[in-house]
UniProtKB/Swiss-Prot annotation:
<keyword id="KW-0288">FMN</keyword>
<dbReference type="Pfam" id="PF01243">
    <property type="entry name" value="PNPOx_N"/>
</dbReference>
<keyword id="KW-0560">Oxidoreductase</keyword>
<keyword id="KW-0664">Pyridoxine biosynthesis</keyword>
<feature type="binding site">
    <location>
        <position position="125"/>
    </location>
    <ligand>
        <name>substrate</name>
    </ligand>
</feature>
<protein>
    <recommendedName>
        <fullName>Pyridoxine/pyridoxamine 5'-phosphate oxidase</fullName>
        <ecNumber>1.4.3.5</ecNumber>
    </recommendedName>
</protein>
<dbReference type="Pfam" id="PF10590">
    <property type="entry name" value="PNP_phzG_C"/>
</dbReference>
<dbReference type="InterPro" id="IPR012349">
    <property type="entry name" value="Split_barrel_FMN-bd"/>
</dbReference>
<comment type="similarity">
    <text>Belongs to the pyridoxamine 5'-phosphate oxidase family.</text>
</comment>
<feature type="binding site">
    <location>
        <begin position="70"/>
        <end position="71"/>
    </location>
    <ligand>
        <name>FMN</name>
    </ligand>
</feature>
<dbReference type="GO" id="GO:0008615">
    <property type="term" value="P:pyridoxine biosynthetic process"/>
</dbReference>
<dbReference type="InterPro" id="IPR000659">
    <property type="entry name" value="Pyridox_Oxase"/>
</dbReference>
<feature type="binding site">
    <location>
        <position position="60"/>
    </location>
    <ligand>
        <name>substrate</name>
    </ligand>
</feature>
<dbReference type="GO" id="GO:0004733">
    <property type="term" value="F:pyridoxamine phosphate oxidase activity"/>
</dbReference>
<feature type="binding site">
    <location>
        <position position="77"/>
    </location>
    <ligand>
        <name>FMN</name>
    </ligand>
</feature>
<dbReference type="GO" id="GO:0010181">
    <property type="term" value="F:FMN binding"/>
</dbReference>
<comment type="pathway">
    <text>Cofactor metabolism; pyridoxal 5'-phosphate salvage; pyridoxal 5'-phosphate from pyridoxine 5'-phosphate: step 1/1.</text>
</comment>
């Protein structure tokens, strides 16, 4: 049973029955209030044995299809997502005293999407994507700088193509929770849930 109307009446912050629209409302507020990187999110993954891992990444796109980030596919997170294609995200905006948590299945973005985003990156970042063997042992800073120089010379002034080992993932949400801090830890929590992308969202409130 949907409970959004009741939640809106009580708190005044759950203003949409569409969790993606509500997320964008909160993100716009965060962009106005947070000093930098309002789109930073904790990405939690697990390997095939279930051992968890977490790190901060940047959200690059969010729409009805899901939440997109980009990475080296040979990194720890890339390999973990290959073994276990589920993940969780957490956005925390301290200035707003709000957070959003997402859980869902993870699918790769299309080559066309990855190419289009890669083309928008700074040239030095594009070269860095070729130079960095992300998450693998590094003898010293010089080794990385040497690789950067190698690929900078290779591409010269020509266009830097996207390497095959660099692309993006889309977290297709099954569960999205909106949380707002309240006095005495009597926080507001609203959850949107569904099993499949084609299903309608179900909502419920949770005890803090």
């Amino acid at each position: 049973m949907n409970d959004v109307t009741t939640a809106t009446d009580e708190s005044g912050i759950f203003t949409s029955e569409d969790p993606i629209a509500l997320f964008h409302e909160w993100m716009e507020l965060a962009r106005a209030k947070e000093p930098e990187d309002a789109n930073a999110m904790a990405l939690a993954t697990a390997d095939a044995s279930g051992f968890p891992d977490v790190r901060m990444v940047l959200l690059k796109e969010a729409d009805a299809r899901g939440f997109v980030f980009y990475t080296n596919l040979e990194s720890a997170k890339g390999l973990e997502l290959k073994e276990n294609s589920r993940a969780a995200l957490c956005f925390h905006w301290k200035s707003l005293r709000r957070q959003v948590r997402v859980r869902g299945d993870v699918i790769p973005v299309s080559k066309e999407e990855a190419d289009a985003y890669f083309a928008t990156r700074a040239r030095d970042s594009q070269i860095g994507a070729w130079a960095s063997k992300q998450s693998r042992p590094l003898a010293g800073r010089f080794e990385l700088e040497k690789q950067v120089a190698v690929f900078a010379a290779k591409f010269g002034v020509s266009r830097v193509p996207r390497p095959d080992h660099w692309s993006g993932f889309r977290v297709v949400p099954r569960h999205i929770e909106f949380w707002r801090d309240r006095p005495f830890r009597l926080h507001d929590r609203l959850v949107f849930e569904r099993e499949k992308p084609a299903e309608a969202w179900r909502t419920k409130k949770l005890f803090p």
